[in-house]
Each structure stands twice: as structure tokens, then as C-alpha cells.
Amino acid sequence: MLELRPNCELCDTDLPPEAADARICSYECTFCAACVEDVLRDVCPNCGGGFQPRPIRPRTAWRDGTGLGHDPPSQRRRNTPYSGEEISAFVAGVRDVPVTER
């Protein structure tokens, strides 16, 4: 089950389940679109992968066993352990490699 993390791991802005600006990598690291575009340049600082829009989980259980009531978002806030300098250096070394070749 996709973990819906509650915040951007870089700037700590809230990203509720319905946030259209939430971005995730293949490991579910979660960042806001502004950080992905302006700071991270589509490079996850944790794994080096790229980002995609996070799916929005339906509020309503349209089918049994689905929806936010059945699979609620995480309450655990996460923050990247890397400094701004570490992130900048990492991004600079990875961003020119196509996502499909990382």
C-alpha cells in the first residue's frame, strides 16, 4: 500500500492526501512540486531517482476495503537527513543522467 506521507521532506510544507503538488519517487520519498522543480531538479536526494505526481487516494470507499477510511495517510513526518550543500552536490552529479538510465 502506498504510504501517503504528510509533508515535504525538504521544506516541511504540509501535503495532505488530496495535495495535487505532492511528488514521490519509487521509494515513496515525498516532496512538494516546488522543491522538486526548483531545488532537487527531479533528483531524489535519498535515492537519485526521479519523481512523479503522487496519486490521490479517494476519500470515499467506492469499493469495500478502499478509500482513506480504510487506508489512512501516515502521520509520521519525515525530513531528509542531508544538508543543503550535500543535496546540491548530489543533484549536480545526477541531474544530467536520464531518469531511465539512473
Where are these regions (language model features)?
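Intrinsically disordered, low-complexity regulatory regions in eukaryotic proteins
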Residues: 1-102
